[in-house]
Amino acid sequence: MNKNELVSAVAERAGL
């Protein structure tokens, strides 16, 4: 998993 995937996953969890 790269950083972009991690950021995307966190953003989805945050409701962004």
UniProtKB/Swiss-Prot annotation:
Keywords: DNA condensation, DNA-binding. The keyword DNA-binding applies. GO terms for biological process: chromosome condensation. GO terms for molecular function: DNA binding. Histone-like DNA-binding protein which is capable of wrapping DNA to stabilize it, and thus to prevent its denaturation under extreme environmental conditions. Belongs to the bacterial histone-like protein family. This is DNA-binding protein H3-RL. It comes from Rhizobium leguminosarum. The lineage of its organism: Bacteria, Pseudomonadati, Pseudomonadota, Alphaproteobacteria, Hyphomicrobiales.
